[in-house]
């Protein structure tokens, strides 16, 4: 989808219908950029003359779909104001921080939110034992349930540590790897 802003402005610039179409590109993870060899342009039905050093679609000698989207979209957003600030730095920008600085007036972080009428621990049907902030005791039953599903023994006074995430560098797993020996000394279940 990152190519749509470019395609609308280039492939379909002859069609007046698209004059009124504005595009917004949302960055969920700047590490997923869609980088391909320049030969990909033909397969994507893009003009070959769009690709040159420092062009709006080129990064380090490759076609970069995300850069194309960032350069041609009318607006850019991401999942939070904090993430928006982070990815404008060389540490987290994955090579596209310069593009984001160039488009800074069209770039916003919009905070993700949770609908607490759905994701509510005392109403959520996906949680076996409902609980509230006033009564956390059913959390022990949920812990027993989860451990039984994973074949682990239940220890009421031992913390259970888990994470739901993609195993990518941006999630900070290098920090866990660096300290795994110390972490394993704790009396915890993983």
List the model feature ranges, each with a label:
Residues 1-190:
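Catalytic cores of nucleotide-sugar-dependent glycosyltransferases that transfer UDP/GDP/TDP-activated
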């Amino acid at each position: 989808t990152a190519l749509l802003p470019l395609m609308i402005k280039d492939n379909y610039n002859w069609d007046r219908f698209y004059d009124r179409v504005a595009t917004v590109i949302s960055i969920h993870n700047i590490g997923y950029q869609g980088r391909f060899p320049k030969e990909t342009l033909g397969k994507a039905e893009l003009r070959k003359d769009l690709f040159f050093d420092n062009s709006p679609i080129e990064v380090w000698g490759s076609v970069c779909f995300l850069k194309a989207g960032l350069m041609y979209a009318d607006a850019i957003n991401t999942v939070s104001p904090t993430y928006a600030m982070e990815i404008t730095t060389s540490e987290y920008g994955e090579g596209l921080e310069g593009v984001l600085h160039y488009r800074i007036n069209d770039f916003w972080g919009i905070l993700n939110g949770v609908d607490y009428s759905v994701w509510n621990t005392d109403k959520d049907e996906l949680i076996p034992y409902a609980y509230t902030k006033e009564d956390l005791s059913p959390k022990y039953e949920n812990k027993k349930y989860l451990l039984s599903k994973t074949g682990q023994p239940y220890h009421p006074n031992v913390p259970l540590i888990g994470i739901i995430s993609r195993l990518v560098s941006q999630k900070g797993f290098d920090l866990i790897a660096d300290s795994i020996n110390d972490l394993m000394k704790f009396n915890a279940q993983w």
